[in-house]
């Protein structure tokens, strides 16, 4: 099973512990280093494969029976068609692809032009959003200040908006059947 855009590997490692043969894929070497460290601490180093790859240039050197992709990974990809095509190319017939995405509603109405501030004992975070309707994307800026060390973290990234009809058509085009769509809060239809 492949974890496409595995980030820090939380799901990858949980699935490895559950007995799945896992491939964690991320384009960030920093994220993969975190996964390696966690895997070593858990005694899982030899039980998973980590690959540094861009999902738009995915090459697995073989097939997989399942793939997962969480934390809105596919919203971060500007070319949904190529990313889905790549996942489909390496998927065995009858394979399963489980993923989550933010909806146009969330991008336009929840994130939109809003700013969120989070204050914790050890850090504060300011999350700013700008919805670009013409390009159908949210431009996001995150600033985190760590109180004890005085360190400052700044990141800018985009999430692209894909409507359900586009997602459904893209999946079908690349050999997938959309079995169900669930609400991210209730997990209902």
Language-model segments: residues:
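SAM-dependent methyltransferase
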Residues: 98-170
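Class I SAM-dependent methyltransferase "Motif I" SAM/SAH-binding loop
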Residues: 5-9
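Class I SAM-dependent methyltransferase SAM/SAH-binding core
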Residues: 12-57
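A short acidic, Gly/Pro-enriched loop at the edge of an enzyme's catalytic core
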Residues: 59-66
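A short glycine-rich, Lys/Arg-flanked "PGG" loop and its adjoining helix->strand segment in the class I
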Residues: 81-93
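A short beta-strand submotif of the Rossmann-like class I SAM-dependent methyltransferase core
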Residues: 69-70
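A short His-aromatic
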Residues: 75-76
């Amino acid at each position: 099973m492949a974890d496409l855009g595995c980030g820090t590997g939380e799901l990858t490692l949980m699935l490895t512990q559950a007995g799945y043969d896992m491939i964690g894929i991320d384009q960030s070497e920093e994220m993969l280093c975190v996964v390696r460290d966690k895997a070593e601490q858990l005694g899982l180093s030899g039980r998973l494969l980590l690959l540094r790859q861009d999902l738009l240039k995915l090459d697995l050197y073989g097939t997989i029976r399942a793939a997962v992709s969480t934390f809105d990974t596919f919203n971060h990809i500007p070319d949904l068609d190529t990313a889905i095509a790549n996942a489909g190319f390496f998927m065995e017939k009858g394979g399963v692809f489980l993923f989550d995405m933010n909806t146009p509603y969330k991008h336009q109405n929840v994130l939109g032009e809003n700013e969120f501030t989070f204050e914790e004992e050890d850090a504060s975070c300011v999350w700013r959003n700008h919805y670009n309707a013409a390009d159908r994307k949210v431009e996001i800026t995150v600033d985190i200040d760590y109180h004890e060390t005085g360190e400052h973290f700044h990141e800018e990234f985009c999430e692209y908006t894909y409507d359900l009809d586009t997602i459904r058509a893209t999946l079908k085009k690349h050999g997938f059947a959309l079995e169900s769509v669930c609400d991210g809060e209730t997990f209902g239809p």
